[in-house]
A protein has these predicted regions:
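Ligand-binding clefts of soluble mixed alpha/beta catalytic domains
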Residues: 1-146
Length: 146
């Protein structure tokens, strides 16, 4: 039923407000109105983690690919080198999944104190309502270029 959830999230016509409160990786991130679904607002709690995949998953995948490649070539994989590579990959991914790292790269609208979540939710709903009900007056004069 994952495809139904993704279709619903993509086509929904109500405000999309996302709060990363724990770990959010890969397809699950999309399915729960992550950045790819252009939510109206997206915030993170300080302990939240987000990314394409976790460091552990990424390093495990790379290790499996390297072992399979070595076996295809008829070579014994260098497990010591793979362990070092695994640690390096985990370190890089882990440093980039932190809420402050991702927020600093504008992948959300800010890191919020969990105690303020209800207040922020109310403010964002008011903002969305105002956007929907605001009338804009067209520009009635030309724009001079200098």
């Amino acid at each position: 039923h994952g495809s139904k959830m993704i279709q619903a999230a993509a086509n929904i016509r109500v405000p999309k407000l996302t709060f990363y409160v724990g770990a959010s990786y890969g397809a699950g991130n999309y399915g729960m109105a992550g950045l790819g679904y252009e939510p109206d607002f997206l915030f993170s709690w300080p302990g939240a983690k987000t990314g394409v995949m976790s460091g552990e998953s990424a390093s495990g995948t790379m290790e499996a690919v390297a072992i399979a490649g070595a076996k295809r070539r008829g070579v014994e994989p260098d497990m010591e080198a793979l362990a070092k590579q695994r640690a390096a990959i985990e370190k890089v991914f882990s440093s980039q999944e932190d809420a402050f790292f991702t927020s600093g790269r504008l992948l959300d609208h800010g890191v919020v104190d969990p105690r303020d979540t209800r207040k922020i939710l109310g403010f964002t709903l008011e903002t969305i309502w105002e956007r929907k009900h605001r009338t804009l007056n067209p520009n009635a004069f030309g724009i001079g270029r200098m």
